[in-house]
Amino acid sequence: MQGWMFGYQRHIWDYETLGALVSRVPNEKMLLLDLAVDYNKHFWHSEVNWEYYKGFYNKQWVYSVIPNMGGKVGMTGVLDFYANGHLEALASANRGNLVAHGLAPEGIENNEVLYELVTDAGWSNRHIDVREWLRQYSMNRYGAAPEQLMTAWDYLMKSVYGSFTDHPRFNWQLRPGSVKNGSINMNADYFRGLESFIAASDKLKDSPYFLTDLCEMTAHYLGGKAELLTKLIDQEYLLGDTLKARFLQSRFETLMLGMDRILSWHPTLRLDRWLSFAKKSARTDAQRKQYEINARRIVTVWGPPVDDYAARIWSGLIGNYYLGRWKEYYRGRESGEPVNLAEWERRWVEENHDSYRWNTDFDIVSFAKEMLALSKDISTAQLLLNRPNMVGTWSLGSGKAKEFEYHIPARMLTNMKGITLEGLKGNGMLECSGLMLVADGIAVVSSSEVISSKNGKLYCKMIVPNGVNANNGCVLTLKLKSKDGNVAGVIACDM
């Protein structure tokens, strides 16, 4: 029996209800999979299941983690936990009938270092020194572990590999205009670590596995810088500087195409490879067409209601799908005309037949350094409109009404008390109505109240029911109306 529900739905499953479900089954006839110990520890922040359920009524059980949802390529995961978390279960008085150690990712071909660590840890009943393990891993994978490489690992363990993110995605992997911040832990150490990894290429340029990882790490670096650019572009549109916004858009396009090009050299992180698998499985032309459409859909829109779930960082997908969708969005920002991104996505999935191959006859190390130099100056220091827990921006013409949609990080739901809209441009009155919060496709908060702004701010109170986790996404929708004058501002969650 898969045990996701035991951590995810504690408001339903307690010790007694689990007993009602499993106690009559002979112990040797049942195997429980404690599916997501990492979620218990680092996302739900709840007591681990073997303690909470007191050894699962002595049923056989497997210690398991889910390092990945949907095959996302973004980096995340507390390496020390994946190396040593199982030791807590082995030492527990409630270990019960623990029989195995495993992992259950929804997708692989991502976060290779994490999978190597988890599978190695399964053979150990002793504490693993993760830094020493990383040194040995680097020696085995690249043939050497120079100082710059170890410095890179140190920094990454203070960012993406020292934190756990549910559904790690850059904001440009989600529909434009619906999300302000991605969910990847892009602190200063993230960029320092990736810069150090790229610098290690001077000593590791002859290692084929290092060059493969260099492609991916460079893409992660550029992906973070591209996210910052989307925020800067949005800021300039909000402040009315369309010339600067267009200049930044050209930089954004350069970085996206840079990611796309360098990953074309990677053996697995490519859309053409994925589509080739699908088409080769077909026996007829009709099947081939349908399989290709299905393959496109699952790595892009996926849903609804779960959209952009797979979030692959792949050559062909970045330059053609993600960049294409943002260019369509910016076309609407420049012209002031509405764009139908859902229709654009449908056409890309069902009608697109573009080629996704670059000429790969180029020097990987030189190109990685070139792209680093082009993007290193982009930083959060250039963001003037940052607010705590900010989730997006809004702008309206005089007397206009418009519906807005914002992705809300699931981690905010537990303490979320409401939202605040702050006007930064214009002095017109703002009205908010039709507020709705949808978690996992279900409306959990809905209000028909019409609220007006006071002194440039508008506050909407929200009561999020207990037990709402929104593992597959949380979206806030609302309708705003400008009573008089052009207005623009930001929206933030109140915690």
Where are these regions (language model features)?
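Extracellular carbohydrate recognition and processing domains
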Residues: L385-L413, S447-I463
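Noncatalytic modules at the cell exterior or secretory-pathway interfaces
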Residues: A410-E422, V468-T477
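Histidine-centered catalytic/metal-binding microenvironments
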Residues: G177-L385
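Extracellular beta-strand elements of beta-rich domains used
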Residues: L435-L437, I442
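Beta-strand acidic-aromatic groove motif in beta-rich domains, primarily in extracellular
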Residues: L430-E431, G485-C493
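Catalytic-core regions of glycoside hydrolase
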Residues: M1-T151, M157, P176-N185, F191, ...
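Short beta-strand-plus-loop segments that form exposed binding edges in beta-rich domains
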Residues: L421-G428, K479-D484
